[in-house]
UniProtKB/Swiss-Prot annotation:
Gene Ontology cellular component terms for the protein in this record: chloroplast thylakoid membrane; proton-transporting ATP synthase complex; stromule
HAMAP family: ATP_synth_delta_bact (MF_01416)
InterPro entries membership: ATP_synth_OSCP/delta_N_sf (IPR026015), ATPase_OSCP/d_CS (IPR020781), ATPase_OSCP/dsu (IPR000711)
Quaternary data: F-type ATPases have 2 components, CF(1) - the catalytic core - and CF(0) - the membrane proton channel. CF(1) has five subunits: alpha(3), beta(3), gamma(1), delta(1), epsilon(1). CF(0) has three main subunits: a, b and c.
Gene3D superfamilies documented for this protein: N-terminal domain of the delta subunit of the F1F0-ATP synthase (1.10.520.20)
Family statement drawn from the similarity comment of this UniProt entry: Belongs to the ATPase delta chain family.
Keywords: ATP synthesis, CF(1), Chloroplast, Hydrogen ion transport, Ion transport, Membrane, Plastid, Thylakoid, Transit peptide, Transport
Organism, scientific name: Sorghum bicolor (Sorghum)
Protein name: ATP synthase delta chain, chloroplastic
Tree of life domain: Eukaryota
Pfam families in UniProt: OSCP
Keyword Translocase: no
Role summary: This protein seems to be part of the stalk that links CF(0) to CF(1). It either transmits conformational changes from CF(0) into CF(1) or is implicated in proton conduction.
Length: 247
């Protein structure tokens, strides 16, 4: 399986950026809001899980992820920190991609002090915002660490909706230069008419060379500029139909 790496590139409208620069205005400092306050009433762990996990647990997990993401987005909007929050969550998404991390936090036999120490270490290492740290603590207290990746996805959907952002995934053999990513973002923006474009990049050596761009709802649209695609097209041109031979 190809090794994948995730990064982020954001394109903002040139007009908005120019207006901000010409005005000389300094952005207002974000106000403080507590995720713990916004998170009251969020679903917590049920110690007696239903037997039909495939039918019941997954929908409940998705509903819980949506609830957490909605509560966190309210705090981020109130603080004026939507972009910083989605950036922090993408950092957490990479950390919690390791299942052992989520299992550690959801293990009821692990002392809370040990969990707190690790949360503090993560917060310091990745310079997380205070309300995001509060968010992690609430998730851990409710034994919901295993659904954190789903929470991040739901939050990104909310962020994209609020900011008019189109997300595109660029897959290449080697990491593309920033100017190349900027051109791709501009192309996606022109094709979709989106106000903003966020690019996520990942590496896949199986492409041989070139790149692909997936965008649209659930990545339904694809731009394939890979050498692998070109080879497949050339190969198909030389494929001959089966001709029966008479013996």
């Amino acid at each position: 399986m190809a090794a994948l790496r995730l990064a982020s590139f954001t394109l903002r409208p040139a007009a908005a950026a120019a207006a901000s620069a010409s005005s000389g205005a300094t952005p207002a400092a974000p106000r403080s809001a507590s995720f713990a306050r916004a998170a009251r009433g969020l679903p917590s762990l049920r110690l007696a899980p239903p037997r039909r996990r495939g039918d019941l647990v997954r929908p409940r997990a998705e509903a819980a992820a949506d609830s957490y993401a909605s509560a966190l987005s309210e705090v981020a909007v109130e603080n004026g920190t939507l972009e910083q929050t989605v950036s922090d969550l993408e950092k957490l998404q990479k950390i919690f991609a390791d299942e052992t991390v989520a299992e550690f936090f959801d293990n009821p036999t692990v002392p809370r002090e040990e969990k707190t120490a690790l949360i503090d270490e993560i917060a310091k290492s990745y310079e997380l915002q205070p309300h995001v740290v509060n968010f992690i603590n609430v998730v851990v207290d409710n034994f919901r660490a295993t659904i954190l990746p789903e929470i991040v996805v739901e939050f990104e959907n909310i962020f994209n909706s609020l900011t008019g952002t189109e997300v595109a995934t660029v897959t290449s053999v080697v990491q593309l230069e920033s100017q190349d990513l900027a051109q791709i973002a501009q192309h996606v923006q022109k094709m979709t008419g989106a106000k903003n474009v966020r690019l996520k990049t990942q590496l896949d050596p199986e492409l041989i060379a070139g790149f692909t761009v997936q965008y649209g709802r659930d990545g339904s649209s694809l731009i394939d500029m890979s050498v692998r695609k070109q080879i497949e097209e050339i190969t198909s041109e030389f494929e001959l139909p089966d001709v029966p031979l008479e013996v």
